[in-house]
Structure formats: structure tokens, C-alpha cells
Amino acid sequence: MTSDRSDRTVRFDQIRPDTPVDAAVRLRAFALSGRPVSLDTMSPEALSELISAIAHDLVAQGKAGDLTDDLIPPVDKLTVMRPKDRAHGDWASNIAMQLAKKAGMKPRDLAEPFAAALAEAEGIESVEVAGPGFINITLDSASAAAVVDKVLAEGAAFGWNGHLGGETLNLEFVSANPTGPIHIGGTRWAAVGDSMARVLEANGATVVREYYFNDHGEQINRFAKSLVAAAHGEECPADGYKGAYIDEIAQRVIDEAKADGVDVLNLPRVDGGVDADGNPLGEGDSEQREEFRKRAVPMMFAEIRESMKNFRVSFDVWFHENSLYEDGEVERAIADLRERGDIYEKDGATWFASTNHGDDKDRVIVKSDGNYAYFAADIAYYRNKRHRESNPADVAIYMLGADHHGYIGRMMAMCAAFGDEPGRNMQILIGQLVNVMKDGKPVRMSKRAGNVVTIDDLVEAVGVDAARYSLARTDYNTPVDIDLDLLASHTNENPVYYVQYAHARACNVDRNAADAGITHEGADLALLDTEADGEVLAALAQWPALLSLAGDLRAPHRVAHYLEDLAATYHKWYNVERVVPMALTDPEERQDDAAREALRIAKNPEPARAAARLKLNDAVRIVIAAGLDLLGVEAPERM
């Protein structure tokens, strides 16, 4: 049984990150994979495939009224959900209510033949039609537990798929100016962007992680002016950069230049002169400022790279804006648009006719004084991403801050002007603000950077794991408050601690089982038949669809939410089901005979059941570790 990919392509711009889970699952990407879905695990995806096949069979048999094959929705829109009440079964479908009107039948009348066909499927214990036409499905224990064998066989790759394969996604994130340390907003993009890249790769995509250094233009000039002022002990310029890091870098420039035989403080500070390459300096420049710029910007680059490395974020490409000018790419991009009829001259300036492609106004790209507008580099950069020799992007994903919302129109217009499809070849994600809190009050000050909190400040306060997890677990469209006190605590209210503790607890169960001589070799998974067992099995079965959905929605926060739900289910299971025999406590020994015997049975499972539970325990451990790794967070074995 295979899926027709061409009928089920889900475009990114057709699914919003805030789509509710139940609705989004109807668009889940497993139906996009074009690969057979094994029914031996009877996962939600397998049930959807089975229900689709039954629908077509009922049409062929004339048992579905006026329904025809073309009226049956694709598999990804056939909802299979987890009932809130376990008494209603393991899974439920509303297929009969979806199709009843098209079939010209009452929902319950259409549900009956569906239920009869489902009841004959291997791995299904019982099927019941309930209410107006819901179909409740109960799996047999062995079928429900088959997911455990699948997890142990596939390991950390369980749930990975190839439905985003065949395309190269260029994911640009952080891209902070090299004028200071990474601030808290950039830190959020580092956590979200790297996690997103990992999730996309788990869905088969080829991902190019890219950092764009804005090392051209006025901000770099302001940075250099600030350094010169600091080097001379002068007040920072009104539009300059402040903070202890400015003093530090200024001194490093002085020391480095001195080692090279250059007395940087005695270079001319007046306008004019030439730069390091012998080119005339423009108005507002000076030899001294150019020397500071030339030496300080690489220092800032190095510091940013080190911060990213310490945050477990790596990039495939570190792209320098200045190279677009040096290599003539800006001129070539403008020439390309001119050939396409989207460039004109007016008032001594060169304009991009972006209104031809949906923007609210045309944009200047070469000012009347002959200098390039900032947007000129944006145009050249997108063209470079799409047509570079190494790993050209099929999809260019930009992760921008909240202050860039006004850029979307012009960026999408530029995409369309090059003959590409906005929302398809270019995707823009806008992130919201981060507030850092301590003792219930906002934290505004950094040791080095003045009135901002930096990536290094956050890591020093709570560690990499807590920092990354807390920033990645919230939808980037939503402002987030980072509570330093909470993240430093070892309590269940701390989400990263709660998930990591579930992994450490599972590892501890393994150690105790080994000490007790318990293994899961030859375990009979049909013995996983309690309500708590079933909840854990169902949670594991939902991981593949959730992972696929997170990739389609560009939503790594869904991985974190899944892990928290799985951890909660596991902790509950751990508290009621035993793997390793446990002696009764003194208060328990003093209970009446019947109560004491019930406790003894609960705390001392027979060997076969203990082996099955140990295997389930290991499956949970594997999935939690894999999920944490997608978020760049470690899975400790002891806590």
C-alpha cells in the first residue's frame, strides 16, 4: 500500500505554525513519503492507510452509497485520534462523519461497514461504533506493543523519514552584526534555528546552515568610531556602541597593532587617506578608524564563532556581506533584474519596481549619491543562495527578528521578480522578543554588553541545556519569558529537568535490572496490557507523525512539547508498574493480608512481565534521548 505523493504535497505556506495539533495531524507528512506503511505496528499512520483502503473497497463493493473514489480524502486528511477516555479504545476515527454527506448515508449507517472491515484486520482486537458515528478501535496487546520492537530496531532513527528529501534547504539564522556579542534575541534564533535544522534533516532534507555577517555599511563604521573613542578615553559617540567589550576590543587592537609595528593611536584621525589596500577613504573615514575596523571586525567574528560553538551550534557557511560587493554580485543581480524589466531610474536614483510583484511601494537600490541602499545586498544575497555552485538552495529560509516584519513584502517581491515562488522558494520566519527574568523582575544588564543580555550571560546563568531547551520549546511566533530561577531549579516545574530526569530514571531502571539479572531478551510484549502500559505505547506510537509534522511546520517547539508529554506518561507509568522487584515498606507490611498481598504482587512482577516492561522502558529512553538531541540538549544517564 503506497501513497501518491503528487496528491499530497503540503506547502509550507498552507500550514501555519499555530495550527492546532489535532488539525495539523490531518496534514501530517507521513502521507507524503510515498513509501509503504507497515501495518505490523498498527500506528496511527498505518490505521489511516487501512481506513483509506477500506473506504475504496467499500466503494468498489457498492456498500458506500453515492460515494466515489474521487470523493475520498487523501490519507493525510483521514483523522485518527487518541480518545480522551481509554474505555473508548486505543484510537478513534470520524471517517464515517467525514464521508456521510458525500455518500448520502447516515454517519452510523456508513460507520457499520467500516467497523466490520476494521474488525477483520490483524492486530485489531475490537471495533465499536459510538455516538453519532465515531469508530473506536482497540488493538490487541501484541500489536499495540509492536512499536517497542520498532524503536529498539531503529534506535535514534525511529521516526526519521525521507518526505523532505530531494531538496536543499538553506536555513539562515542568527546573522547578528559583528559589532558586539550575540544578544538574547539572537540566542533564541541560535536555539530555534539549530533545532529546526536537525528536525528538517530528520525528515530527509539537505540543510545548509548559514550565518550572514553584515560587515558592510554604517553599523560597522559606528563600531569602528566607538572603538577609536574608547582607545582615546573619549566619550562614546551618540550613535555608537557601549559596553565593557568595546574597551576590551579597543585594547586588543592596540596590542595587536603594536606587535605588528603599527602605532594605531598615532595614525591620522582626519578624513582622507587610504585604507589597508591603498583605496581612498571616503568622507567620514580616517586611517585610524580604518585600522581599528580592519582589526576589530575579525576579532568580533572570532568571538561570535566561539559563542556559537559553546552553544552547540555549527554553521556550514559563514557568508560575508562585503563579498557581495567585492565579487561584483550586487551589480550582476541588478543587471539581472534590469533584463527582467524590474529596474528603472528616477530622481537620480536606481529603483526596483517591487510593486510589480505585490510590494506596497518601489524600493531604491542605488541612491542618488551613488551609494548602494541596504536592500541591494539583500537582492544579491538571495540570488547567490539560489544559484551558487555548491549546494544552491531550492528553498531559502530566513529567520528574522520582530523588527524585520516590514521587510517581508519587499523580500517576497524580490523572490517573485527572479521568477521564483514566494512561500515556496523563499520562506520568512519572524521571531518575537525574549524577556529574561530573575526574582520576578526583568534582567537588563550584562557584564560586558551594557543594557542587553548576551548568549554568554544566559549560558553562565543556567547552562547550555536549559538555555537551549527553554528557548526552543516556545513557538518562535510568541514572546517568551525566560525565568532564570526556574531554569536553575531541580524541580518538576523546570521543563528541561523534567524531561532529562525521565531519561536518567530510565537509565537507572536499566542499571537496577542488570543488577537483578533481568533482561528483555525474548520478552513477550503482549504482557504490556495494563492501562499505564497502553498510555506509554500510544505515546511512543505518535512520535513519527509528530516529528514529521514538526518538520512541515518548521516547529521544533512541538518536539519539546511531545517530550514533556512522553516524560509525564513515563513518570506516571514508573510510579505504578514495576520492572525490578521491590521490598514492601514497614507501613505496607502492617496492612491487612489482602492489601499486603496486592502490594507484593504489584511490587514483584513475574519475570516475563518484568522483561516486557524493561523493553518498554528502553524504548522510552531511546526516544527521549533522540528527541533531546534534535533540540541540541544532552540526555544525562544520572541526575
Regions found by a protein language model. Name each.
Residues 2-145, 152, 156-158, 163-639:
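Non-catalytic interaction-recognition regions
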